[in-house]
């Protein structure tokens, strides 16, 4: 169970909720602020002064006053009308993370919802009630309206949810878990759908996967370096200290540790006529390290956003209810674009290492396409082509999304972040990257084995053994698609990196 303190939740907690399915609830000390804000909203709802979202319409209809008797229907109508999502459902793990993020936002005590709303969200997480949320339809301002409306619909007994492996109508799903729908009070519907939690959940998932891919890239690229008998001189700490970038320094140190003790490296330390390796070998710390730095910058933004109150209007500490724009997901959009760039570049340089290893003119005496009998066998020829295709896909998907604003809601919401699909694309990019890195691992393993009787280092030997437990040596042509998929799984699960038995830089 993760106890979430609003404003202080950590990335480690959020990753545990997303990756391990941990349950989560707010710390009890959040309740007084939540209830105080709810009391202030109830007071405003009973008054005559117009307060956006409490006794007015929404968006372009904000100038229309709503009678006190209609405020409950107003909130229900808001949820129903905004359930306009389309496309494939959000992955359940990411949907659960989204709910946890909504709890954190409500827990700041600035949204004005009753504690009953918090308790129902906590109950849904605890009982495994996961709303079915179509993944397309948000422009990332005014919040992730459509997807969050599908979440809120389940809370009022509408929509659909998964529970116990079954997809049920919202009311039935709640009943299955021993929960009851809630009747929304003033502003509660708006508080549930205003916010960036959908975009942020997807961006965090991309971040967590991206960091794991970066760790795998360090291990696999070290194995590739040994496969082509690359030099470790570019990993010397003095080089990286002279530049000073933290990620670069850490990447070089990790690769030095991975290659320490390699007999392959020692065999050509003296007398090698090659003066410099190609950039995809020589500049690995500069590229992967830079990607690590970018991922960390995105992590800082997303950690802040995860703990933010992104509702509108907000109940301030002095009791005033003020309209603002915290629902605008521009920070999340920028973070997602940064993650996309990092994923693309990790894959781009990895693909060049694959191309290097299969090319006999560049691989320092490895056989063409890493097969013992080239000609009769094509070896990894088309596996390299697959990595080129996926690399190109990722390059196209790395184009920024935040620059593509368009006016919505009759020009009331005239600049939007597009953070939702900017974050959502990261899942596809990670899938592609895992295949690129997994294929590189297969190529590097073949290359290292061709250097026998010389052996690689102990850490990389353990990595090679872990790979071979899933992907046998390719001695003759066979259908390689299952092997590529198996290697990609080892990348995504972290099994390949863990096999090295060394500490890795932390996010």
From Swiss-Prot:
Protein name as annotated: Histidine ammonia-lyase
Keywords in alphabetical order: Cytoplasm, Histidine metabolism, Lyase
PANTHER family per the UniProt record, alphabetical: HISTIDINE AMMONIA-LYASE (PTHR10362)
Similarity annotation: Belongs to the PAL/histidase family.
Pathway: Amino-acid degradation; L-histidine degradation into L-glutamate; N-formimidoyl-L-glutamate from L-histidine: step 1/3
Gene3D superfamilies, sorted: Fumarase/aspartase (Central domain), Fumarase/aspartase (N-terminal domain)
InterPro entries from the UniProt entry: Aromatic_Lyase, Fumarase/histidase_N, HutH, L-Aspartase-like, Phe/His_NH3-lyase_AS
Gene Ontology molecular functions: histidine ammonia-lyase activity
Chief localization: cytoplasm
Compartments where found: Cytoplasm
Biological process according to GO: L-histidine catabolic process to glutamate and formamide; L-histidine catabolic process to glutamate and formate
A single GO cellular-component term on record: cytoplasm
Reaction catalysis annotation: L-histidine = trans-urocanate + NH4(+)
Cited Pfam families: Lyase_aromatic (PF00221)
Residues found modified as 2,3-didehydroalanine (Ser): 142
Enzyme class per UniProt: lyase
EC number, as in UniProt: 4.3.1.3
Signal peptide: none
Crosslink position(s): 5-imidazolinone (Ala-Gly): 141-143
Source species: Cereibacter sphaeroides (strain ATCC 17023 / DSM 158 / JCM 6121 / CCUG 31486 / LMG 2827 / NBRC 12203 / NCIMB 8253 / ATH 2.4.1.) (Rhodobacter sphaeroides)
Post-translational modification: Contains an active site 4-methylidene-imidazol-5-one (MIO), which is formed autocatalytically by cyclization and dehydration of residues Ala-Ser-Gly.
């Amino acid at each position: 169970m993760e106890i979430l303190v609003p404003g202080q939740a950590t990335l480690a907690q959020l990753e545990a909720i997303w990756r391990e399915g941990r349950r989560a609830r707010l710390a009890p000390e959040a309740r007084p602020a939540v209830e105080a804000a709810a009391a202030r909203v109830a007071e405003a709802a009973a008054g005559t002064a117009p307060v956006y979202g409490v006794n007015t319409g929404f968006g372009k209809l904000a100038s229309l006053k709503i009678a006190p008797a209609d405020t409950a229907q107003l909130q229900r109508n808001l949820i129903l009308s905004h359930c306009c999502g389309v496309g494939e459902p959000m992955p359940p793990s990411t949907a659960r993370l989204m709910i946890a993020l909504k709890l954190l936002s409500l827990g700041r005590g600035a949204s004005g919802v009753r504690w009953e709303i918090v308790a129902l969200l906590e109950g849904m997480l605890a009982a495994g009630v996961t709303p079915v949320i179509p993944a397309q339809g948000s422009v990332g301002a005014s919040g992730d309206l459509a997807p969050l409306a599908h979440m809120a619909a389940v809370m009022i007994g509408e929509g659909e949810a998964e529970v116990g492996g079954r997809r049920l109508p919202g009311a039935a799903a709640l009943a299955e878990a021993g929960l009851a729908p809630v009747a929304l009070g003033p502003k509660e519907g708006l508080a549930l759908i205003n916010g960036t939690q959908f975009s942020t959940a997807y961006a965090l998932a991309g971040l967590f996967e991206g960091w794991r891919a970066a760790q795998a890239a360090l291990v696999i690229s070290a194995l590739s370096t040994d496969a082509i008998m690359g030099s470790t001189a570019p990993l010397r700490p003095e080089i990286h200290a002279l530049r000073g970038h933290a990620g670069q320094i850490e990447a070089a140190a990790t690769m030095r540790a991975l290659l320490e003790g390699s007999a392959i490296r020692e065999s050509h330390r003296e007398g090698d006529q090659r003066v410099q390796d190609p950039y995809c070998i020589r500049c690995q710390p500069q590229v992967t390290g830079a990607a690590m730095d970018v991922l960390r910058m995105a992590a800082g933004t997303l950690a802040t956003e995860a703990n933010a109150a992104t509702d509108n209007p907000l109940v301030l500490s002095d009791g005033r209810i003020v309209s603002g724009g915290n629902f605008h997901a521009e920070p999340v959009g920028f973070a997602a674009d940064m993650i996309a760039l990092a994923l693309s570049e990790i894959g781009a340089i990895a693909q060049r290492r694959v191309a290097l290893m299969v090319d006999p003119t560049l691989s320092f005496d490895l056989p063409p396409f890493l097969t013992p009998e080239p000609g009769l066998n094509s070896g990894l020829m088309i596996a390299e082509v697959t990595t080129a295709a996926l690399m190109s896909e990722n390059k196209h998907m790395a184009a920024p999304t935040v620059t593509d604003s368009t006016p919505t809601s009759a020009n009331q919401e005239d600049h939007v972040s597009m953070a939702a699909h900017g974050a959502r694309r990261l899942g596809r990019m990670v899938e592609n990257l895992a295949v690129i890195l997994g294929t590189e691992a297969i190529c590097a393993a073949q290359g290292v084995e061709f250097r026998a009787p010389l052996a690689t280092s102990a850490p990389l030997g353990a990595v090679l053994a872990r790979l071979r437990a899933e992907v046998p040596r390719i001695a003759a042509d066979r259908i390689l698609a299952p092997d590529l998929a198996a290697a990609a799984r080892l990348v995504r699960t972290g099994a390949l990196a863990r096999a090295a038995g060394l500490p890795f830089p932390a996010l």
